[in-house]
Protein backbone atom coordinates (compact mmCIF):
# COMPACT_ATOMS: atom_id res chain seq x y z
CA UNK A 1 0.00 0.00 0.00
CA UNK A 2 2.81 2.37 0.93
CA UNK A 3 4.58 1.59 -2.33
CA UNK A 4 1.44 2.35 -4.34
CA UNK A 5 1.01 5.61 -2.43
CA UNK A 6 4.58 6.59 -3.25
CA UNK A 7 3.97 5.90 -6.92
CA UNK A 8 0.74 7.92 -6.93
CA UNK A 9 2.42 10.89 -5.25
CA UNK A 10 5.39 10.69 -7.59
CA UNK A 11 3.11 10.51 -10.63
CA UNK A 12 1.14 13.55 -9.47
CA UNK A 13 4.25 15.62 -8.83
CA UNK A 14 6.00 14.64 -12.04
CA UNK A 15 2.96 15.34 -14.18
CA UNK A 16 2.17 18.67 -12.53
CA UNK A 17 4.36 20.53 -15.01
CA UNK A 18 2.64 19.13 -18.08
CA UNK A 19 -0.85 19.33 -16.50
CA UNK A 20 -0.58 22.95 -15.45
CA UNK A 21 0.18 24.05 -19.02
CA UNK A 22 -3.48 23.60 -19.99
CA UNK A 23 -4.69 25.93 -17.24
CA UNK A 24 -6.20 28.96 -19.01
CA UNK A 25 -5.11 31.65 -16.56
CA UNK A 26 -1.72 30.35 -15.54
CA UNK A 27 1.59 30.58 -17.33
CA UNK A 28 5.04 30.23 -15.77
CA UNK A 29 8.40 29.65 -17.38
CA UNK A 30 9.46 27.81 -14.19
CA UNK A 31 6.99 24.99 -14.71
CA UNK A 32 8.77 22.22 -16.57
CA UNK A 33 7.83 19.19 -18.63
CA UNK A 34 10.57 16.85 -17.44
CA UNK A 35 10.06 14.33 -20.23
CA UNK A 36 10.49 17.08 -22.80
CA UNK A 37 13.55 18.41 -20.98
CA UNK A 38 15.23 14.98 -20.96
CA UNK A 39 14.37 14.17 -24.59
CA UNK A 40 15.73 17.48 -25.87
CA UNK A 41 18.97 17.05 -23.93
CA UNK A 42 19.46 13.52 -25.26
CA UNK A 43 18.48 14.10 -28.90
CA UNK A 44 21.35 13.08 -31.16
CA UNK A 45 22.06 12.00 -34.71
CA UNK A 46 19.84 9.06 -35.52
CA UNK A 47 17.50 9.59 -32.54
CA UNK A 48 14.95 12.41 -32.52
CA UNK A 49 13.64 14.15 -29.42
CA UNK A 50 10.15 12.92 -30.36
CA UNK A 51 11.28 9.27 -30.37
CA UNK A 52 12.95 9.67 -27.00
CA UNK A 53 9.93 11.49 -25.54
CA UNK A 54 7.53 8.72 -26.56
CA UNK A 55 9.85 6.07 -25.08
CA UNK A 56 10.31 7.61 -21.63
CA UNK A 57 8.24 5.87 -18.94
CA UNK A 58 7.89 5.63 -15.17
CA UNK A 59 9.95 2.83 -13.57
CA UNK A 60 7.93 0.17 -11.71
CA UNK A 61 9.91 0.85 -8.51
CA UNK A 62 10.57 4.42 -7.24
CA UNK A 63 14.01 3.34 -6.04
CA UNK A 64 15.05 2.96 -9.69
CA UNK A 65 14.41 6.64 -10.37
CA UNK A 66 11.64 8.94 -11.53
CA UNK A 67 11.88 8.32 -15.28
CA UNK A 68 13.35 5.51 -17.36
CA UNK A 69 14.46 5.41 -20.98
CA UNK A 70 14.75 1.89 -22.47
CA UNK A 71 17.55 1.98 -25.05
CA UNK A 72 16.76 -1.30 -26.82
CA UNK A 73 14.84 0.29 -29.70
CA UNK A 74 17.85 2.51 -30.54
CA UNK A 75 20.36 -0.35 -30.81
CA UNK A 76 19.74 -1.04 -34.50
CA UNK A 77 20.00 2.61 -35.53
CA UNK A 78 23.13 3.37 -33.50
CA UNK A 79 24.69 -0.07 -34.09
CA UNK A 80 25.51 -0.43 -30.41
CA UNK A 81 24.22 -2.58 -27.58
CA UNK A 82 21.49 -1.10 -25.35
CA UNK A 83 23.87 -1.22 -22.37
CA UNK A 84 26.54 0.79 -24.22
CA UNK A 85 23.98 3.32 -25.45
CA UNK A 86 22.62 3.81 -21.93
CA UNK A 87 26.13 4.18 -20.48
CA UNK A 88 27.19 6.68 -23.16
CA UNK A 89 24.07 8.80 -22.69
CA UNK A 90 24.45 8.74 -18.91
CA UNK A 91 28.02 10.02 -19.12
CA UNK A 92 27.09 12.81 -21.51
CA UNK A 93 23.96 13.99 -19.68
CA UNK A 94 24.50 17.51 -18.31
CA UNK A 95 24.45 18.03 -14.55
CA UNK A 96 22.56 21.31 -14.20
CA UNK A 97 20.52 20.87 -11.04
CA UNK A 98 17.32 19.76 -12.78
CA UNK A 99 18.25 16.08 -12.97
CA UNK A 100 19.98 14.89 -9.83
CA UNK A 101 21.27 11.64 -11.32
CA UNK A 102 21.33 9.80 -14.68
CA UNK A 103 22.25 6.13 -14.23
CA UNK A 104 22.66 3.32 -16.77
CA UNK A 105 21.23 -0.02 -15.60
CA UNK A 106 20.93 -3.08 -17.88
CA UNK A 107 20.12 -1.18 -21.04
CA UNK A 108 17.94 1.40 -19.30
CA UNK A 109 18.83 5.00 -18.54
CA UNK A 110 17.19 5.93 -15.24
CA UNK A 111 16.73 9.55 -14.18
CA UNK A 112 16.24 10.93 -10.69
CA UNK A 113 15.05 14.51 -10.64
CA UNK A 114 15.99 17.17 -8.12
CA UNK A 115 13.09 16.91 -5.65
CA UNK A 116 13.89 20.22 -4.00
CA UNK A 117 13.64 22.03 -7.32
CA UNK A 118 10.44 20.15 -8.19
CA UNK A 119 8.87 21.06 -4.85
CA UNK A 120 9.71 24.73 -5.36
CA UNK A 121 8.29 24.70 -8.88
CA UNK A 122 5.13 22.93 -7.72
CA UNK A 123 4.50 25.32 -4.84
CA UNK A 124 5.25 28.33 -7.04
CA UNK A 125 2.78 26.98 -9.57
CA UNK A 126 0.05 26.49 -6.98
CA UNK A 127 0.57 29.98 -5.55
CA UNK A 128 0.63 31.58 -8.98
CA UNK A 129 -2.54 29.76 -10.09
CA UNK A 130 -4.45 30.54 -6.90
CA UNK A 131 -8.07 29.42 -7.08
CA UNK A 132 -7.55 28.35 -10.69
CA UNK A 133 -5.09 25.63 -9.68
CA UNK A 134 -6.14 22.37 -11.30
CA UNK A 135 -8.50 23.97 -13.81
CA UNK A 136 -8.21 23.43 -17.54
CA UNK A 137 -9.80 24.16 -20.88
CA UNK A 138 -10.27 20.52 -21.85
CA UNK A 139 -14.05 20.91 -21.98
CA UNK A 140 -14.13 24.09 -24.05
CA UNK A 141 -17.07 24.07 -26.43
CA UNK A 142 -18.72 21.07 -24.77
CA UNK A 143 -21.85 21.00 -22.63
CA UNK A 144 -22.54 18.55 -19.82
CA UNK A 145 -26.05 18.27 -18.39
CA UNK A 146 -26.28 17.08 -14.79
CA UNK A 147 -29.63 15.97 -13.37
CA UNK A 148 -29.38 16.04 -9.58
CA UNK A 149 -31.27 16.68 -6.32
CA UNK A 150 -34.62 16.57 -8.16
CA UNK A 151 -36.83 17.28 -5.17
CA UNK A 152 -40.48 16.30 -4.92
CA UNK A 153 -43.00 19.11 -4.70
CA UNK A 154 -44.64 19.42 -1.27
CA UNK A 155 -42.03 17.21 0.42
CA UNK A 156 -39.35 18.66 2.71
CA UNK A 157 -35.69 17.79 2.29
CA UNK A 158 -34.62 14.81 4.36
CA UNK A 159 -31.09 13.58 4.96
CA UNK A 160 -31.39 11.09 2.12
CA UNK A 161 -31.61 13.93 -0.41
CA UNK A 162 -28.13 15.12 0.54
CA UNK A 163 -26.32 12.42 -1.47
CA UNK A 164 -27.68 13.34 -4.90
CA UNK A 165 -27.47 17.05 -4.09
CA UNK A 166 -23.86 16.98 -2.88
CA UNK A 167 -22.57 14.60 -5.57
CA UNK A 168 -24.37 16.44 -8.36
CA UNK A 169 -23.23 19.85 -7.16
CA UNK A 170 -19.62 18.62 -6.92
CA UNK A 171 -19.77 17.29 -10.49
CA UNK A 172 -21.33 20.56 -11.66
CA UNK A 173 -18.47 22.57 -10.18
CA UNK A 174 -15.78 20.15 -11.38
CA UNK A 175 -17.02 20.19 -14.98
CA UNK A 176 -17.19 23.99 -14.95
CA UNK A 177 -13.66 24.06 -13.54
CA UNK A 178 -12.47 21.88 -16.42
CA UNK A 179 -13.84 24.28 -19.02
CA UNK A 180 -17.14 22.56 -19.82
CA UNK A 181 -20.43 24.41 -19.85
CA UNK A 182 -22.23 22.58 -17.06
CA UNK A 183 -26.04 22.74 -16.95
CA UNK A 184 -27.48 21.89 -13.54
CA UNK A 185 -30.99 20.47 -13.85
CA UNK A 186 -33.39 20.01 -10.95
CA UNK A 187 -35.88 17.57 -12.47
CA UNK A 188 -38.70 18.37 -10.06
CA UNK A 189 -41.02 15.57 -8.99
CA UNK A 190 -44.17 17.52 -9.79
CA UNK A 191 -46.31 14.88 -11.47
CA UNK A 192 -48.37 12.05 -10.05
CA UNK A 193 -51.45 10.97 -8.14
CA UNK A 194 -49.91 12.09 -4.84
CA UNK A 195 -50.81 15.67 -5.72
CA UNK A 196 -54.45 14.71 -6.00
CA UNK A 197 -54.11 13.25 -2.49
CA UNK A 198 -52.52 16.45 -1.25
CA UNK A 199 -55.30 18.63 -2.61
CA UNK A 200 -57.89 16.29 -1.14
CA UNK A 201 -56.16 16.44 2.26
CA UNK A 202 -56.01 20.22 2.11
CA UNK A 203 -59.69 20.43 1.20
CA UNK A 204 -60.63 18.24 4.18
CA UNK A 205 -58.22 19.42 6.88
CA UNK A 206 -56.19 22.34 5.58
CA UNK A 207 -56.23 26.01 6.49
CA UNK A 208 -54.53 28.52 4.18
CA UNK A 209 -53.23 30.71 6.99
CA UNK A 210 -51.75 27.73 8.83
CA UNK A 211 -50.16 26.38 5.65
CA UNK A 212 -48.67 29.79 4.81
CA UNK A 213 -47.24 29.93 8.32
CA UNK A 214 -46.03 26.32 8.45
CA UNK A 215 -44.82 26.18 4.87
CA UNK A 216 -43.73 22.90 3.36
CA UNK A 217 -43.85 21.04 6.68
CA UNK A 218 -47.53 21.93 7.07
CA UNK A 219 -48.15 20.57 3.56
CA UNK A 220 -46.23 17.40 4.38
CA UNK A 221 -48.26 16.91 7.57
CA UNK A 222 -51.42 16.93 5.46
CA UNK A 223 -49.91 14.34 3.10
CA UNK A 224 -48.87 12.07 5.97
CA UNK A 225 -52.32 12.39 7.53
CA UNK A 226 -54.00 11.47 4.26
CA UNK A 227 -51.94 8.28 3.97
CA UNK A 228 -52.89 7.23 7.48
CA UNK A 229 -56.53 8.35 7.67
CA UNK A 230 -57.95 8.53 4.14
CA UNK A 231 -61.18 6.67 3.45
CA UNK A 232 -61.97 4.95 0.15
CA UNK A 233 -64.16 7.91 -0.74
CA UNK A 234 -61.23 10.27 -0.17
CA UNK A 235 -59.02 8.06 -2.36
CA UNK A 236 -61.59 8.44 -5.14
CA UNK A 237 -61.67 12.21 -4.56
CA UNK A 238 -57.86 12.28 -4.79
CA UNK A 239 -57.91 10.51 -8.15
CA UNK A 240 -60.48 13.01 -9.38
CA UNK A 241 -58.36 15.97 -8.18
CA UNK A 242 -55.36 14.58 -10.07
CA UNK A 243 -57.53 14.25 -13.18
CA UNK A 244 -58.55 17.88 -12.72
CA UNK A 245 -54.89 18.93 -12.53
CA UNK A 246 -54.15 17.09 -15.77
CA UNK A 247 -57.21 18.50 -17.53
CA UNK A 248 -56.22 22.08 -16.65
CA UNK A 249 -58.87 22.81 -14.01
CA UNK A 250 -58.14 26.31 -12.70
CA UNK A 251 -58.77 25.75 -8.98
CA UNK A 252 -56.83 22.47 -8.84
CA UNK A 253 -53.88 23.97 -10.70
CA UNK A 254 -53.89 27.13 -8.57
CA UNK A 255 -53.61 24.96 -5.45
CA UNK A 256 -50.86 22.88 -7.03
CA UNK A 257 -48.93 25.98 -8.12
CA UNK A 258 -49.21 27.34 -4.58
CA UNK A 259 -47.78 24.13 -3.15
CA UNK A 260 -44.99 24.32 -5.73
CA UNK A 261 -44.23 27.94 -4.86
CA UNK A 262 -43.98 27.10 -1.14
CA UNK A 263 -41.73 24.13 -1.95
CA UNK A 264 -39.32 26.11 -4.13
CA UNK A 265 -39.10 28.90 -1.57
CA UNK A 266 -38.12 26.30 1.03
CA UNK A 267 -35.66 24.26 -1.07
CA UNK A 268 -33.89 27.32 -2.47
CA UNK A 269 -33.17 28.34 1.12
CA UNK A 270 -31.59 24.92 1.70
CA UNK A 271 -29.60 25.19 -1.54
CA UNK A 272 -28.31 28.61 -0.53
CA UNK A 273 -26.97 27.18 2.74
CA UNK A 274 -25.29 24.34 0.82
CA UNK A 275 -23.96 26.66 -1.93
CA UNK A 276 -25.79 24.61 -4.55
CA UNK A 277 -27.12 26.16 -7.76
CA UNK A 278 -29.23 25.08 -10.73
CA UNK A 279 -29.76 26.39 -14.24
CA UNK A 280 -33.12 24.71 -14.77
CA UNK A 281 -36.05 23.64 -12.60
CA UNK A 282 -37.92 21.95 -15.45
CA UNK A 283 -39.74 19.08 -13.77
CA UNK A 284 -41.86 16.17 -14.91
CA UNK A 285 -44.92 18.33 -15.70
CA UNK A 286 -42.81 20.34 -18.13
CA UNK A 287 -42.73 17.31 -20.43
CA UNK A 288 -46.50 16.70 -20.46
CA UNK A 289 -46.89 17.97 -24.04
CA UNK A 290 -43.62 16.36 -25.15
CA UNK A 291 -44.51 12.74 -24.36
CA UNK A 292 -47.08 12.32 -27.15
CA UNK A 293 -44.51 12.65 -29.96
CA UNK A 294 -42.27 10.12 -28.20
CA UNK A 295 -45.09 7.58 -27.96
CA UNK A 296 -46.01 8.23 -31.61
CA UNK A 297 -42.41 7.64 -32.70
CA UNK A 298 -42.20 4.40 -30.74
CA UNK A 299 -45.39 3.23 -32.41
CA UNK A 300 -44.26 4.29 -35.90
CA UNK A 301 -40.96 2.45 -35.50
CA UNK A 302 -42.71 -0.73 -34.41
CA UNK A 303 -41.21 -0.65 -30.94
CA UNK A 304 -44.46 -0.27 -29.01
CA UNK A 305 -46.33 -3.43 -28.09
CA UNK A 306 -49.44 -4.14 -26.04
CA UNK A 307 -49.14 -6.28 -22.93
CA UNK A 308 -52.12 -6.81 -20.62
CA UNK A 309 -53.58 -3.52 -21.82
CA UNK A 310 -50.39 -1.55 -21.22
CA UNK A 311 -48.03 -0.23 -23.91
CA UNK A 312 -44.45 -1.51 -23.58
CA UNK A 313 -41.12 -1.78 -25.37
CA UNK A 314 -39.91 -5.38 -25.26
CA UNK A 315 -36.35 -5.49 -23.92
CA UNK A 316 -36.16 -9.24 -23.26
CA UNK A 317 -33.63 -9.71 -26.13
CA UNK A 318 -31.32 -7.40 -24.17
CA UNK A 319 -31.68 -9.20 -20.85
CA UNK A 320 -34.16 -6.76 -19.31
CA UNK A 321 -37.86 -6.78 -18.47
CA UNK A 322 -40.17 -4.70 -20.67
CA UNK A 323 -40.03 -0.92 -20.40
CA UNK A 324 -43.52 0.34 -19.52
CA UNK A 325 -44.49 3.37 -21.60
CA UNK A 326 -48.23 3.75 -20.96
CA UNK A 327 -50.45 2.13 -18.34
CA UNK A 328 -53.64 0.35 -19.34
CA UNK A 329 -55.58 3.56 -18.59
CA UNK A 330 -53.30 5.53 -20.93
CA UNK A 331 -51.38 7.30 -18.16
CA UNK A 332 -47.67 7.97 -18.66
CA UNK A 333 -44.92 6.61 -16.44
CA UNK A 334 -41.46 7.69 -15.30
CA UNK A 335 -39.86 6.13 -18.37
CA UNK A 336 -42.15 8.07 -20.71
CA UNK A 337 -41.21 11.36 -19.10
CA UNK A 338 -37.50 10.50 -18.94
CA UNK A 339 -37.48 9.63 -22.65
CA UNK A 340 -39.09 12.97 -23.46
CA UNK A 341 -36.69 14.79 -21.12
CA UNK A 342 -33.59 13.21 -22.68
CA UNK A 343 -34.72 14.11 -26.21
CA UNK A 344 -35.55 17.67 -25.12
CA UNK A 345 -32.18 18.11 -23.40
CA UNK A 346 -30.26 16.91 -26.43
CA UNK A 347 -32.21 19.26 -28.68
CA UNK A 348 -31.90 22.21 -26.28
CA UNK A 349 -28.34 21.84 -24.99
CA UNK A 350 -26.70 19.51 -27.55
CA UNK A 351 -24.88 17.94 -24.62
CA UNK A 352 -21.57 16.08 -24.79
CA UNK A 353 -22.72 14.00 -21.81
CA UNK A 354 -25.89 13.92 -19.73
CA UNK A 355 -25.49 12.65 -16.17
CA UNK A 356 -28.25 11.37 -13.90
CA UNK A 357 -27.23 11.44 -10.22
CA UNK A 358 -29.79 9.00 -8.85
CA UNK A 359 -29.66 6.16 -6.28
CA UNK A 360 -28.54 2.71 -7.41
CA UNK A 361 -32.07 1.32 -7.00
CA UNK A 362 -32.86 3.00 -10.33
CA UNK A 363 -30.11 1.13 -12.23
CA UNK A 364 -32.61 -0.97 -14.20
CA UNK A 365 -34.82 2.02 -14.97
CA UNK A 366 -31.97 3.95 -16.59
CA UNK A 367 -30.65 0.91 -18.44
CA UNK A 368 -34.13 0.51 -19.93
CA UNK A 369 -34.51 4.18 -20.85
CA UNK A 370 -31.05 4.35 -22.44
CA UNK A 371 -31.71 1.16 -24.42
CA UNK A 372 -35.09 2.41 -25.68
CA UNK A 373 -33.45 5.63 -26.89
CA UNK A 374 -30.82 3.54 -28.65
CA UNK A 375 -33.53 1.46 -30.33
CA UNK A 376 -35.21 4.70 -31.41
CA UNK A 377 -32.04 5.51 -33.34
CA UNK A 378 -30.66 8.13 -30.97
CA UNK A 379 -26.92 7.47 -31.35
CA UNK A 380 -26.25 9.89 -28.49
CA UNK A 381 -27.84 7.42 -26.05
CA UNK A 382 -24.26 6.28 -25.38
CA UNK A 383 -23.62 9.72 -23.86
CA UNK A 384 -26.20 9.23 -21.10
CA UNK A 385 -24.64 8.23 -17.79
CA UNK A 386 -26.30 7.04 -14.58
CA UNK A 387 -24.18 8.17 -11.62
CA UNK A 388 -25.43 5.78 -8.94
CA UNK A 389 -24.94 6.02 -5.18
CA UNK A 390 -26.13 4.14 -2.10
CA UNK A 391 -29.30 5.03 -0.23
CA UNK A 392 -29.32 6.48 3.28
CA UNK A 393 -31.40 4.51 5.77
CA UNK A 394 -32.27 4.65 9.45
CA UNK A 395 -31.44 1.97 12.01
CA UNK A 396 -34.91 0.48 11.66
CA UNK A 397 -35.04 0.64 7.86
CA UNK A 398 -35.54 2.97 4.91
CA UNK A 399 -36.89 6.47 5.35
CA UNK A 400 -40.41 7.26 4.19
CA UNK A 401 -41.88 10.75 3.89
CA UNK A 402 -45.33 9.20 3.41
CA UNK A 403 -45.07 7.52 6.82
CA UNK A 404 -43.37 10.50 8.47
CA UNK A 405 -40.30 8.34 9.12
CA UNK A 406 -37.48 10.75 8.22
CA UNK A 407 -34.65 12.97 9.49
CA UNK A 408 -35.10 16.47 8.08
CA UNK A 409 -32.04 17.98 6.45
CA UNK A 410 -32.43 21.39 8.09
CA UNK A 411 -32.14 19.69 11.48
CA UNK A 412 -28.71 18.42 10.45
CA UNK A 413 -27.21 21.40 8.63
Would you name each region that the model predicts?
Residues 3-6, 21:
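Charged/polar low-complexity intrinsically disordered segments
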Residues 7-15, 43, 179:
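Compositionally biased amphipathic helical and low-complexity segments enriched in hydrophobic
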Residues 24-38:
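Active-site-proximal helix-loop elements at catalytic-domain edges
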Residues 36-37, 43-77, 81-413:
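NTP-dependent nucleotidyl-transfer catalytic core
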Amino acid sequence: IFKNSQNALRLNLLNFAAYVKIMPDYKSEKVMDYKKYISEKLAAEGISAEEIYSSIALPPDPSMGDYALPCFKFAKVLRKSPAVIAQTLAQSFPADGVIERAEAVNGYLNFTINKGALARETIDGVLAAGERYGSSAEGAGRTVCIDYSSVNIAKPFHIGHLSTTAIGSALYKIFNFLGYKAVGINHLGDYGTQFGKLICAYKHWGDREEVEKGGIHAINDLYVRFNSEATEQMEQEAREYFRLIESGDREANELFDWFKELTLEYVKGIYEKLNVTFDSYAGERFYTDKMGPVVDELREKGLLKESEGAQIVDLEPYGMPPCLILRSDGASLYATRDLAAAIYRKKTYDFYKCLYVVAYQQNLHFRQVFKVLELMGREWAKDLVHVAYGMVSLEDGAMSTRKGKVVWLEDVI
